[in-house]
Structures are given as structure tokens and as C-alpha cells.
Amino acid sequence: MSLDFLPFSRPSIGEDEIAAVEQVLRSGWITTGPKNQELEQRFAERLGCRHAVALSSATGALHVTLLALGIGPGDEVITPSLTWVSTANVITLLGATPVFVDVDRDTLMCSAQAVEAAIGPRTRAIVPVHYAGSTLDLEGLRTVAGRHGIALVEDAAHAVGSEYRGRPVGSRGTAIFSFHAIKNLTCAEGAMFVSDDSALAERVRRLKFHGLGVDAYDRLSHGRKPQAEVIEPGFKYNLADLNAALALVQLKRLDALNARRQALAERYLERLAGLPLAPLGLPAHKQRHAWHLFILRIDAEVCGLGRDAFMEALKARGIGSGIHFIASHLHHYYRQRQPRLSLPNSEWNSARLCSIPLFPDMRDDDIERVARAIEEILEKRR
């Protein structure tokens, strides 16, 4: 009898989420409205930040954030190559140039030293990435950004619920969180921009909704004139209340969801100890890991098979997996433009990274199933 397929990730959706979405559907107001405003307020309260702006995706949030910072043609933005390629795409579409830096071989995050070495006369912003639920050396990066007068925008897509030195990621400075379907807090598609910069937050809020000073619900609830004026050209990146209602329930559950992720990750670490799988290293600073991903590095020289063959072997046993990520500079478009760029740690990891199943609704038996499958795969190659 075959086992059900175990995906690499699956959202944890319960009756409370379903009821919250149903309530919005029955309310008569399903687009951006009161649930959106409540989500922004609750998120800001949780982090202790000054401003929170909900958007339809982290990609859209980064787009309007960099635009609000004045990033454009001739500018350079420093970012690690080992991240989802949307970061490089947004920078490029603004007419700027992504300056890719390498990451630490084991934490897969960029250092303040690597970033500072890449700063040039055209550098306007730094977009470092909190990776897999672990956290960046923020103090070092803030020092570098401050010394050079360069904007720092944290990519916190993996870090909702993470803490850096006792404070939530996003509680200080500017950061962008993702609420995509596989994230620790999901609303299917969505994001949150947070900042203590009032002028930047105001412009992001304006740019995410056509460049208007108000949204549709403001005009309805506050009796403003039906056609607001465009202050500057903007985009359509607002989050609907259907999504916001789902996110609100998930926000209430976040601590419990992340605690379950941690318990599962600890079980993996215990169960897979001693196997030649090279799990990620942790930074030296104090942190709370959100365990967005559980990542192995599959090196053919020590495992007896490469990453792609390993993933196929898992699939044959009914187990899903993922790759996070193929380094951005290795994608065809960017390789054509920077053919000589060499980032050894990013490239080594790109060829070996494998994310194995990790999501709150997994059972302890699922961890055992994955561990036994991995042991079997490796044993056959010895």
C-alpha cells in the first residue's frame, strides 16, 4: 500500500481561517478595507514598529520601496545572489544595476564586510536577506549603511517571527515580509512593509495604490469625494480584505505555528545527525530562528549522488522537496550580462541545496518517514 505524497510545504489552514474569509465574503466589502487596516495595526503592534503597510506581494513591496527611495537608472543596489530572483528583477526593471555579493558558505547570508567591499560611488541601497528563518548580522549591516549614507531594506520574506538579539525582525529600520502560501504566516499571496521612516512609509502607501492619497475604503468610510487625485503615478499592489482576514488569524497563531516548526526542525537535527548532509550553520549572535525552511546540502562526493538525483529519489518515495535557491547571477539573463562574475559560496550551494518537508501540520511520523527515506537513499550509494 503506497503512502500519501508528503509535500515539501503545505499551509496550515483551519476552521478559524475559513470562518474569517467567509465573514468577509458575507460583509459586502471584499477588497482593501477594514480587515486590511486591522492587519496593519496588529502587525505593527506585534513588532513594535512605527508603520506597517500591507501589499499584494513582497515583490510589489520591494518595487515600490526602491522606487520610493528614488532608485533608478544609473544606480546600484547591493544584494546577495543567493535569493529569489525577484529582487534582481525589480532592481533591473527600475533601470538600476544589481550588484551581487557572495554569502557565507554555511549560514547562506551576506556579511557586512562583503557588502562594504561592494559599495561604490553609485550604490544607493542594500537589500540583504534573512535566510530560511535565521537572521542577518543587522548591527554590522546598519553600521555599514550608516557610514556610507545608504538605505538598508531587509528582505524578511523568510523571517516572520524571527528575532535578532531579543527583538523581532522588523522592529527597527525598514523590512519587507512575505505572506506567500509556503511562508510561516500565509494569506495565499501578500506582504507587509514595515518601517520607522514616516516619509518613506507614506510614499510606499501612496505608490501601492495608483499614487492616490487614499484607498477605496477611505473614500467610502470617510465620505471623501468619489474621485481622489493622483499625487504621483503609482501601481496596483493593494491587499484585499479576503487575504487580510486570513492573515489576521494566522498572525494570532504565529507563535504556535513557529513553535511547531521548531520542534519538527529539532527532531530532524536529532534524527539526521551523523549523516553527510551538511545542514546550515547558525550565526554567532543571539537569535530566535523561525524555521521557515529545513535545508540540506547534497554533495555527490560525500553522499554518493548529486542533489537532483537525491530529489528524484525522494519523489520516488512520495516525498517532495525544493531548491532555495539557484543563485540569481546563474540565471540566463544575468549570466549574459555578468559572464565573469564568480561567487564561489553561492555557486557551491546552488548546486547542492535541498529543502525537505517542514510545515506545522506535519506529524512526528512524517519526520521519521523522511529520515528513513534519506537513510535508505544514502545507504544504497555507499
Curated annotation (Swiss-Prot):
Q: What is its EC number?
A: 2.6.1.87
Q: Which GO terms describe its cellular component?
A: membrane
Cofactor(s) needed for function: pyridoxal 5'-phosphate
Q: Which Pfam families match?
A: DegT_DnrJ_EryC1 (PF01041)
- Which keywords appear in this protein's UniProt record, sorted alphabetically? Aminotransferase, Antibiotic resistance, Lipid A biosynthesis, Lipid biosynthesis, Lipid metabolism, Lipopolysaccharide biosynthesis, Pyridoxal phosphate, Transferase
The GO annotation for biological process reads: lipid A biosynthetic process; lipopolysaccharide biosynthetic process; polysaccharide biosynthetic process; response to antibiotic
Pathway(s) of this molecule: Nucleotide-sugar biosynthesis; UDP-4-deoxy-4-formamido-beta-L-arabinose biosynthesis; UDP-4-deoxy-4-formamido-beta-L-arabinose from UDP-alpha-D-glucuronate: step 2/3; Bacterial outer membrane biogenesis; lipopolysaccharide biosynthesis
First-tier enzyme category under EC: transferase
Give the similarity note.
Answer: Belongs to the DegT/DnrJ/EryC1 family. ArnB subfamily.
Protein name, UniProt field: UDP-4-amino-4-deoxy-L-arabinose--oxoglutarate aminotransferase
Q: How does it assemble?
A: Homodimer.
Q: What does this protein do?
A: Catalyzes the conversion of UDP-4-keto-arabinose (UDP-Ara4O) to UDP-4-amino-4-deoxy-L-arabinose (UDP-L-Ara4N). The modified arabinose is attached to lipid A and is required for resistance to polymyxin and cationic antimicrobial peptides.
* Gene3D superfamilies assigned: Aspartate Aminotransferase, domain 1 (3.90.1150.10), Type I PLP-dependent aspartate aminotransferase-like (Major domain) (3.40.640.10)
Recorded catalytic activity of this chain's protein: UDP-4-amino-4-deoxy-beta-L-arabinose + 2-oxoglutarate = UDP-beta-L-threo-pentopyranos-4-ulose + L-glutamate
Protein species of origin: Pseudomonas aeruginosa (strain ATCC 15692 / DSM 22644 / CIP 104116 / JCM 14847 / LMG 12228 / 1C / PRS 101 / PAO1)
Query: What gene name is given for the protein in this entry?
Result: arnB
